[in-house]
Amino acid sequence: MKKKQASPRVIIIVGANCGIGYYMVKYLLEHGDYISVLDIELDNLKKLKENYPDRLITIIADAAKDEDIKNGVSETIKQFGKIDIAVHNACLCTFESESDSNYELYNKVMNINFFGALRLSKAILPKMRKQGFGRIIFTSSGVGVTGFGNISPYASSKGAIESLAKCLEIENQKYGISFHLFHPPLTNTASASKLPVPKEFMASPQKVGEGLARHIDSKKFVICHSFSQAMQMKLCYRHPLYMGKMMWKMTTRAKNHGGQ
């Protein structure tokens, strides 16, 4: 029997048409929450919308556009009356080295991954401060902590949101608002498909999405879907460069042996 929330929450998620975000939405709806999804594509959510017409809002929105996010937040509050939790899950991942990446690419990735998180925060913080509570979660990545080869635009953007979340947590704790980071493992999603890593070493997006949704109320600053992932992240935070170099060597070895 599924455990229902004592008081249904209103949760807005930017980037949830597929992968980890989709399974977060599905799990949260099944457990009684009200969900608003902002994404540039919404096709995969049609069935969920049919099953939960009164508890799921889907809004076409681009994480890189201020007005889209502002309008999505306003529409969510208009229909559901409040927002308890906001999640920035949209991301753009590229697999180029620094020498193959121009400023335009860095700006494009930062605009979605970092400034997208900031956009959501700026759109929703005035509302949360007024209501006196709320939590905002950014989906981060281990490479934002450790570094990694041929992925510096993406890794840099994730490193930036690590610092942003810490700063905004300090600034907003007096309002009853907390900031957190989701830290999923390497997951079998479209964005990770180009990595030369055997699929059997990647986590299931359903397992990760459901696990993160289950812990969405965690008081921990870093939220993981499982105990083993939490232990791995402890190592990454304690020995960042060592872990980054080790993972890069392992990935390079897998690529040289034809692991896809």
Region locations from a protein language model:
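Conserved glycine-rich cofactor-binding loop
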Residues: 17-18
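Rossmann-fold cofactor-recognition segment
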Residues: 52-66
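Conserved NAD(P)H cofactor-binding loop of Rossmann-fold oxidoreductase domains
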Residues: 89-94
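Substrate-binding pocket helix/loop in short-chain dehydrogenase/reductase
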Residues: 97-108
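Active-site helix of classical SDR
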Residues: 121, 157
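Residue(s) in the substrate-gating loop at a strand-loop-helix junction
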Residues: 141
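C-terminal helical subdomain
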Residues: 181, 197-233
